[in-house]
A protein has these predicted regions:
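Mid/C-terminal beta-alpha module of Rossmann-like enzyme folds, strongest
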Residues: 60-118, 149-150, 161-191
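Substrate-positioning beta->alpha
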Residues: 20-26, 39-62, 69-70
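A short C-terminal helix-loop "cap" of Rossmann-like NAD(P)-dependent dehydrogenase/epimerase domains
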Residues: 27-39, 95-100, 104-105
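Conserved loop-to-helix N-cap of the C-terminal "lid" that shapes the substrate pocket in Rossmann-like
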Residues: 7, 42, 47-55, 71, ...
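Generic structural signal for alpha-helix termini and adjacent loop/cap motifs
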Residues: 33, 64-65, 157-158
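A structural signal for short, well-ordered beta-strand segments and their strand-loop junctions
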Residues: 6-9, 37-38, 73
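Conserved C-terminal active-site "lid" loop/helix of NAD(P)H-dependent oxidoreductases
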Residues: 51, 109-140, 159-161, 172-173
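Conserved beta-loop-beta element that borders a ligand/cofactor-binding pocket
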Residues: 1-17
Length: 191
């Protein structure tokens, strides 16, 4: 007969010691407390997945007979905005988040920012239907308010790796955020 299979589709997995550097990109900026630039065209809602929940889900899939020859999407159950995401990260780092929404065109004209796209920043929503996973193997996730603070603490207290992608340009990033905010406020005052 045919070999049984189960396909599990996952989004970007986040957590401590993330080998892709996506989580560190956010946490390093949260720890310094400065503003973050979000391309104004990339503000869509999303779901990510905590690494501990991903590992648990894979184990549950293997242990369930209901998952044979099926395809599942798994992701965190909460739907996130970048505003909520940065708010949680910056709060866990002891800071208040500030976002500068700058058009892609302006960002990419800045030296060193030609490929600037924060992880999870997308132009279209990335929302998976989790109902089959919830039904077939009781998939559930850790609330984001629980795993983000422990993840930020791990990076603050234990991570000794290199700076995150683009962090060598952090001073320019902060300068652009400040210049954009000041220019935008000047424009608003004229109306």
């Amino acid at each position: 007969g045919e070999m049984p299979y189960t396909i599990v589709r996952i989004p970007a997995v986040m957590g401590w010691d993330d080998p892709t550097g996506r989580m560190w990109w956010w946490v390093q900026r949260a720890l310094d407390g400065g503003a973050v630039i979000i391309p104004s065209e990339r503000r869509a809602v999303f779901r990510t997945l905590y690494s501990g929940d991903a590992a648990n889900a894979f184990l549950r899939v293997i242990d369930s007979d209901a998952t044979e020859n099926e395809v599942y999407h798994i992701a965190m159950q909460e739907i996130m905005t970048l505003e909520r995401w940065t708010g949680l990260l910056w709060a866990a780092a002891g800071h208040e988040s500030e976002i500068a929404y700058v058009p892609d065109e302006v960002i990419q004209r800045q030296e060193g920012f030609e490929d600037y796209v924060p992880p999870l920043a997308r132009p279209v929503p990335s929302i998976y239907n989790l109902s089959r996973a919830e039904r077939d193997f009781e998939f559930s996730t850790t609330p984001v308010e629980e795993w983000v603070p422990t993840t930020v603490a791990w990076y603050r207290d234990q991570y000794h790796g290199d700076g995150s992608q683009g962090y060598s340009h952090r001073a320019k990033e902060l300068s652009l955020a400040s210049r954009w905010r000041d220019s935008f406020n000047t424009l608003k005052s004229r109306f």
